[in-house]
Amino acid sequence: MAIERTFSIIKPDAVAKNHIGAIYNRFETAGLKIIASKMLHLSKEQAEGFYAEHSERPFFGALVEFMTSGPICVQVLEGENAVLANREIMGATNPAEAARGTIRSDFADSIDENAVHGSDAVASAEREIAYFFSTEELCPRTR
């Protein structure tokens, strides 16, 4: 199995409901190590840059507005097949379709405010990690 890194965001809705600790617990219980983490409030420019691939989609404006509506937590997770592992922990994008016991099933209210974001592939994880973290901010855990 491959040790990978993936990128994760705890979105404004989950931060506002004080679910940060519970979500971090899900990551760690699943064997993922948090090797970088910070809380920030995205500017409009940061949100537009991060979600640039969706700029022509009809939901782009609402997405940017939501992602700038309050603080978020961004983190880098490391572990065996981290991208897939995190996607399984998150559950389906639409919480109504998410399996019981997943983050979105337990903490999200709607497809628009669905608690978390996670990279969909190793390549996107690398790009997303670099958007928010310098190499010096990553703290590989050997113990």
UniProtKB/Swiss-Prot annotation:
> Mind telling me which InterPro entries this protein's record contains?
NDK-like_dom (IPR034907), NDK-like_dom_sf (IPR036850), Nucleoside_diP_kinase (IPR001564), Nucleoside_diP_kinase_AS (IPR023005)
Task: Look up the EC number in the record and give it.
Answer: 2.7.4.6
GO molecular function terms here?
ATP binding; metal ion binding; nucleoside diphosphate kinase activity
Keywords for this entry?
A: ATP-binding, Cytoplasm, Kinase, Magnesium, Metal-binding, Nucleotide metabolism, Nucleotide-binding, Phosphoprotein, Transferase
Subcellular location per the Swiss-Prot or TrEMBL entry:
Cytoplasm
Q: Broadest EC class?
A: transferase
Q: Show the catalytic activity.
A: a 2'-deoxyribonucleoside 5'-diphosphate + ATP = a 2'-deoxyribonucleoside 5'-triphosphate + ADP; a ribonucleoside 5'-diphosphate + ATP = a ribonucleoside 5'-triphosphate + ADP
Cofactors required: Mg(2+)
Catalytic residue positions:
117
SMART domains, per this entry? Answer: NDK
Stored Gene3D superfamilies = Nucleoside diphosphate kinase-like domain
**One Gene Ontology cellular component annotation held by this UniProt entry:** cytoplasm
Sorted alphabetically, which PROSITE patterns does this protein's record hold? NDPK, NDPK_LIKE
Task: Provide the function of this protein.
Answer: Major role in the synthesis of nucleoside triphosphates other than ATP. The ATP gamma phosphate is transferred to the NDP beta phosphate via a ping-pong mechanism, using a phosphorylated active-site intermediate.
Spell out the subunit comment. Answer: Homotetramer.
The UniProt entry's sequence similarity note says:
Belongs to the NDK family.
Q: From the Swiss-Prot or TrEMBL record, give the protein name.
A: Nucleoside diphosphate kinase
Lineage summary: Bacteria, Pseudomonadati, Pseudomonadota, Gammaproteobacteria, Alteromonadales
